[in-house]
């Protein structure tokens, strides 16, 4: 069950994303549509190449919404073999691999 806080956070995150996605971060809309279509979403190190691995998306804006409501649901929907293939395809660094392992 989703907590009331989580529902509110998701609601406001979507509103922020809707306002800013077309101007400042157009990939938000594109990636949300890919997620809904069941397609592959580029990883954080490709979308936000200057972000540190410890970042975790806590920037309280569109990048937080992207990580927590678009990319992580995509990532968590992959099985172990699909995750390994995805990481190989996107040339994951050791630091990002460790970060993702901690999220399992």
Predicted feature locations:
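Polar/charged low-complexity regulatory segments
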Residues: 2-104
């Amino acid at each position: 069950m989703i907590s009331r806080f989580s529902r509110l956070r998701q609601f406001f995150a979507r509103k922020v994303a809707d306002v800013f996605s077309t101007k400042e971060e157009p990939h938000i809309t594109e990636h949300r549509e890919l997620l809904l279509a069941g397609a592959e979403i580029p990883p954080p190190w490709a979308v936000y190449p200057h972000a540190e691995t410890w970042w975790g998306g806590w920037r309280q804006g569109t990048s937080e919404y992207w990580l927590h409501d678009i990319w992580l649901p995509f990532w968590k929907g992959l099985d172990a073999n699909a995750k390994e293939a995805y990481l190989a395809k996107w040339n994951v660094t050791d630091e990002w691999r460790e970060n993702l392992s901690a999220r399992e």
